[in-house]
Design a protein with these regions (language model features):
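FKBP-type peptidyl-prolyl cis-trans isomerases
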Residues: 2-289
Length: 289
């Protein structure tokens, strides 16, 4: 029996239609997966050894909100939102910090802390002093009384006098004490220079020209004739880390005020030494060699 040619043509037509349908479905699925199904983003580069990076940062002390350093000019300008530590310094240019990870130019805690960051990511770094600027030297820390005793008479040689008062010792001249700001009278006997401090009771003074104080009393014959001036310092804990100055060429800052103990502390170390530091860092660029 001869098969019908028309039926064969129908079967071929159905097969072609089925193939077209499969192709259409494949195209639709392809479009769906390519354009509509979210694709996993490629893993970003993360900072590692030898990468050249730039970061923005704000550095504060762990036990306070005071900013001691930053690369961000808006932070530098805003003292209300970002109060500053004594050691904070203004600079001519404000820009992200650039360095090569692991090149030794950064403190260890900062260098280690930026590793693993991708561009645009931020992180808070807690840097103990051992990974920061090292321990403080205890010999450079001086604790004194808020009601402080100062001698009326000081004796020294001419070299010491010149270094302290920035003038040659001549009997009868008046000098200004570089710490207390009051007048003192000079007398010279051979190689010995005597300086007699001459404030008056209730005199308002500004030690180191930094804070207010008052001369409480003067006993000219106390301590075997050396004499004693009692000075009451007007300090409080809100001033800690905020004020500092220079004496004999050395920088210092107010590191403690203990109203219960009646004491205050001046620290001649770097303000970042011996302290845990916080850095808010954001990775801005990353270049891998």
């Amino acid at each position: 029996m001869v098969r019908s040619l028309s039926r064969d043509r129908s079967g071929m037509s159905n097969l072609a239609a089925f193939a077209v349908l499969i192709l259409a479905i494949a195209l639709i699925l392809g479009v769906y997966y390519v354009y509509l199904v979210p694709q996993a983003a490629p893993e970003p580069l993360r900072a590692q050894e030898r990468d050249s990076v730039t970061v923005e940062y704000v550095g504060t002390f762990e036990n306070s909100e005071l900013v001691f350093d930053t690369s961000v000019i808006t932070v530098a300008q805003d003292n209300a939102s970002y109060p500053k530590a004594f050691s904070f310094g203004w600079r001519d240019r404000w820009q992200p910090l650039q360095f090569a990870v692991g090149d030794g130019s950064m403190i260890r805690g900062f260098d280690q802390g930026v590793r693993g960051l991708a561009v645009g990511e931020s992180r808070t770094l807690v840097v103990p002093y051992a990974d920061g600027y090292g321990a403080a030297d205890p010999s450079k820390i001086s604790t004194r009384r808020l009601l402080e005793s100062v001698p009326v008479r000081l004796t020294m040689n001419a070299t010491h006098f010149l270094a302290t008062y920035r003038t040659s010792a001549v009997s009868g001249i008046n000098v200004t004490d570089p710490v207390w700001g009051w007048t003192a009278v000079v007398s010279v006997a051979g190689s010995i220079v005597t300086v007699m401090n001459s404030p008056v009771p209730d005199q308002a003074i500004r030690p180191y020209n930094l804070w207010d104080a008052t001369v409480v009393s003067i006993d000219d014959s106390a301590n075997g004739g050396v004499g004693e001036i009692l000075v009451q310092h007007r300090l409080d804990p809100t001033m800690i880390d905020r004020i500092g100055g220079k004496v004999d060429g050395q920088d210092f800052f107010l590191s403690d005020v203990d109203l219960i103990e009646g004491s205050y502390t001046l620290d001649f170390n770097r303000q970042v030494a011996g302290r845990s530091l916080l850095f808010q860092v954001t990775l801005k660029t990353l270049l891998r060699p």
